[in-house]
């Protein structure tokens, strides 16, 4: 069922209130529905995009200049899934080394996540050498609003309320009593047994920080809310050629044939040996004719005979030529953080300030990863790559496109000194307040976050169900 505003609701009928309708919020609501648990699903925006609604997402970035915060996320039904790229894959097992739970704890939710995303449950890998794997992503075309809108409208267990902004929570004695919301400029209270904050990788921190100011003493002052914020620098790392015939021969029967870009990722052995972070590169599936002509031209200038050989292979379609794109992990850094600014939106809630700077650790990761991959290409004669000078020189990344992977800020952990939520996504020392989404990530790996967000949301719904029936 849909409501355009928060009005005439008997909150006693809904033991769970979920705020946010992106992948985290909708997934949790759908899982609770399967267990016959009624929930309120509350969205700040409307059913469709509007510039007026997006203006509430303004914010200031201090440090590395990334995309404006109002343009790399969506305040509407379905959340930022309306503009996500669709690339889906579990995080590497080693990416969970610093988490209070492990990859195996999420494995049981993988098939459900794939069903939600309408993708195959297939994430193959093939070993190139001791340092690199060829890896496989799945591509989802799911937009959560489009896929689930009618289902939610017809649901007896999910009541969706639009145009209702969550301001903050009120609680005492380690228990959340109600949420303060603003619907059609009218302040309302939302009561429930359990509250789930699923408003995204920036808003989750913003709302908890505002709660701490509005209801002092409720949320522990020591919780590092907003800190350890991360993203995935997406960069143009260079250009390259890969001899597909030789690559297939090297991998024997283990070459991964699939539609989409050719992906290579670091193994844990490379990360440990070079003391770097995780990263992955990809080349587009279709050769970029402009790029490979430029590559051949440059090779002919310095190595004419090899250049002629390359030219022949291009025309035989034995080579994959083009730009090399890269996703690099960022190390958690408490100085990369979200705070509340002095400027407020029209409903009186402070906009955020994001302090963000890419670390030298990430710059070093890109350089050493590419150098080692280049060495592999030469040693096994499967191709050649040319690394951008800026990466060789450890210059600041030039980020491509919008910075949409917002992670950290409400990180998961075992104690309140370096984390905000526990392994079940419950806020430390508060009995009935949960946070869902990539803001809970302890580390980000190189993988797009949506798949892991969905796994964690399914797990969260399971934990709430257990508590409701205990």
Label every model-predicted segment:
Residues 1-16, 34-35, 466-469:
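Extreme N-terminal leader/targeting segments of oxidoreductases
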Residues 14-41:
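N-terminal Rossmann-like FAD-binding beta1-loop-alpha1 element of flavoenzymes
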Residues 22-23, 202, 360, 440:
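Residue-level detector of alpha-helix initiation sites
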Residues 34, 169, 180-252, 437, ...:
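Glycine-rich loop(s) and the adjacent beta-strand/alpha-helix scaffold that form part
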Residues 54, 58-123, 334-338, 346:
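Redox-cofactor-proximal catalytic regions of oxidoreductases
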Residues 59, 222-228, 232-350, 403-406, ...:
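FAD cofactor-binding and catalytic pocket of flavoenzymes
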Residues 66, 101-176, 397-402, 411:
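Conserved redox-cofactor binding core of oxidoreductases
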Residues 161-172, 319-328, 350-357, 361-443, ...:
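A glycine-rich dinucleotide-binding beta-alpha-beta segment and adjacent secondary-structure elements
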């Amino acid at each position: 069922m849909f409501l355009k505003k928060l009005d005439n609701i008997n909150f006693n009928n809904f033991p769970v209130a979920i705020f946010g309708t992106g992948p985290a919020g909708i997934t949790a609501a759908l899982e609770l529905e399967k267990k016959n648990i009624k929930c309120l699903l509350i969205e700040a925006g409307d059913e469709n995009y509007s510039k007026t609604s997006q203006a509430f997402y303004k914010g200031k970035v201090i440090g590395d200049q990334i995309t404006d915060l109002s343009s790399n996320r969506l305040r509407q039904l379905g959340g930022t899934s309306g503009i996500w790229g669709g690339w889906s894959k579990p995080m590497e097992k080693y990416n969970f080394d610093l988490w209070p739970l492990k990859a195996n704890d999420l494995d049981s939710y993988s098939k459900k996540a794939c069903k939600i995303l309408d993708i195959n449950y297939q994430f193959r890998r093939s070993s190139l050498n001791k340092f690199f794997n060829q890896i496989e992503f799945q591509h989802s075309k799911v937009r959560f609003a489009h896929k689930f809108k009618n289902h939610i409208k017809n649901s007896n267990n999910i009541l969706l309320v639009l145009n209702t902004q969550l301001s903050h929570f009120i609680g005492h004695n380690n228990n959340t009593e109600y949420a303060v919301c603003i619907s059609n400029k009218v302040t309302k209270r939302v009561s429930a047994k359990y509250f789930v904050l699923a408003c995204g990788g920036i808003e989750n921190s913003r709302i908890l920080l505002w709660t701490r100011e509005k209801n002092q003493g409720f949320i522990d002052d020591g919780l590092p809310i907003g800190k350890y914020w991360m993203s995935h620098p997406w960069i143009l790392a260079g250009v390259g050629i890969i001899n597909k015939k030789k690559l297939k021969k090297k991998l024997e029967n283990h070459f991964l044939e699939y539609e989409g870009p050719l992906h290579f990722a670091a193994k844990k052995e490379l990360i440990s040996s070079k003391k770097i972070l995780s990263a992955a590169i990809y080349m587009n599936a279709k050769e970029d004719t402009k790029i490979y002509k430029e590559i051949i031209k440059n090779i002919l200038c310095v190595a004419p005979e090899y250049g002629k050989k390359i030219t022949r292979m291009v025309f035989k379609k034995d080579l994959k030529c083009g730009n090399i794109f890269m996703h690099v992990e960022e190390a958690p850094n408490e100085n990369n953080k979200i705070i509340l600014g002095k400027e407020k939106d029209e409903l009186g809630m402070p906009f955020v300030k994001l302090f963000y700077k890419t670390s030298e650790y990430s710059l070093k990761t890109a350089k050493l990863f590419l150098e080692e991959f280049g060495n592999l290409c030469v040693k096994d004669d499967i191709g050649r790559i040319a690394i951008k000078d800026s990466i060789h020189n450890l210059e600041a990344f030039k980020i491509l496109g919008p910075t949409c992977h917002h992670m950290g800020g409400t990180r998961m952990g075992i104690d309140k000194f370096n984390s905000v939520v526990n392994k079940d996504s419950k806020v430390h020392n508060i009995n009935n307040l949960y946070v869902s989404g990539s803001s809970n990530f302890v580390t980000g790996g190189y993988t797009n976050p949506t798949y892991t967000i969905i796994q964690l949301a399914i797990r969260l719904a399971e934990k709430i169900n257990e508590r409701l029936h205990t």
